[in-house]
Design a protein with these regions (language model features):
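A conserved amphipathic helix/loop scaffold
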Residues: 2-169
Length: 169
C-alpha cells in the first residue's frame, strides 16, 4: 500500500532489465508518508503492469474468478474480501477475469511484458490453493522454478546456511 517513490523507480528498472514482478491488489497507492499518489493506479507503474484501476469493491457473496491463458487449467475460485476492477491495456495478457455479469469486463489477474521482463498483477484475494497455483505458474513463467517446486505440498524442502557459511539443503 505504502511505497516510496524510490521503490517504484527501482521496480520499474528491475522489470525493464529482465526481472519478473508479481504484485497484488492495493499496492503502490500512497507514498511512505501515506499521502495518496495523484496519478493513475498503480502509481508510476501502469505501463509496467499494462493496466490501471480506479475502483474496487467487495464481492458480497459469490463472484467467481475464472482463469484463462497459461492458467486455463486452474479451477475457478471465489474472490475473497475485495476485488479491484482492473482495466488492462492493449497487449496485456488477461490470465483471469470475474465470472459476474457486472464485473465480467474487468481483469482479475494480468501479465504484461515491459522492457526485457514482465509484471503480473493479482487484483483480488484468492483461497490458499488457488493463489498457490497462480504463484507456481508465475515462478515457472519466470524460469526460476527449481527441483523443489515440483514437490511443493508433498515434500518439505528446507534450505539454509550453516555456521561455516555453507549452503545446506
Amino acid at each position: 500500500y505504502c511505497t516510496p517513490q524510490e521503490t517504484t523507480d527501482r521496480l520499474r528498472e528491475f522489470v525493464s532489465n529482465g526481472g519478473h514482478l508479481v504484485s497484488t491488489m492495493r499496492s503502490f497507492v500512497t507514498d511512505d508518508e501515506v499521502t495518496v499518489w495523484h496519478d493513475r493506479a498503480p502509481h508510476n507503474l501502469t505501463d509496467v503492469f499494462g493496466m490501471t484501476y480506479n475502483q474496487f469493491t467487495r464481492p458480497n457473496g459469490h463472484v467467481s474468478v475464472e482463469f484463462a491463458g497459461t492458467l486455463a487449467k486452474t479451477p475457478a475460485s471465489d474472490a475473497q474480501a475485495l476485488i479491484e476492477l482492473v482495466t488492462p491495456f492493449d497487449g496485456t495478457d488477461v490470465l483471469a477475469g470475474y465470472g459476474h455479469y457486472v464485473w465480467k469486463d474487468y481483469a482479475a489477474v494480468t501479465r504484461h511484458g515491459f522492457g526485457k521482463g514482465d509484471a503480473e498483477w493479482i487484483a483480488t484475494l484468492l483461497d490458499a490453493d488457488t493463489i498457490q497455483a497462480v504463484l507456481r505458474e508465475a515462478v515457472e513463467h519466470a524460469g526460476i522454478a527449481d527441483a523443489g517446486t515440483a514437490l511443493a505440498g508433498q515434500v518439505t524442502v528446507r534450505r539454509g546456511t550453516n555456521a561455516r557459511g555453507e549452503r545446506v539443503t
